[in-house]
Amino acid sequence: PCFLNYKAGAYGFRFSMIEASTEINDRMPEYCVNRIGHILERRFHQPLCGSRILILGIAYKQDIDDYRESPAIRLINSLQTRGAHTLFFDPYITSFQLEGKVYEGEDELTVELIRDVDIVVITTPHTNVDYGFVQRHAKVIFDTRNATRDIPDRSNIELI
């Protein structure tokens, strides 16, 4: 849609719906940071600052290893700016660079890793992740992609 909007602009046309959706998408990482903060406060009376957050999925789209333009990167940056400690697991991406710093992902999605964080945030719905396993061991999940839709026990799952 962005390319279509760009090309239309070159010919003097505007697609206000595309412009509005782009603006909403650009604000989504900050919206998610606020939601994560509210979930932590409401469920655990815990501030975002100092919380341990596992980001599940860095890739731009499911089942690929490309993180360029990934909203998960902006989400991590915003969370860290607000004092949260972030970790990530992505079966396709072992590390990424942000502002000259290299971020190393977790090697495995283990019971210990999931239990050790305050919240798991699903940002990329990879098909080779066992979300039932994550749900059984997480304190709470914030699912931004509805990856947990088939899990019957929703007591610790919050959707965007």
Go through the PLM ranges and name each one:
Residues 1-160:
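Structural/interface elements that position substrates and couple domains in central-metabolism enzymes
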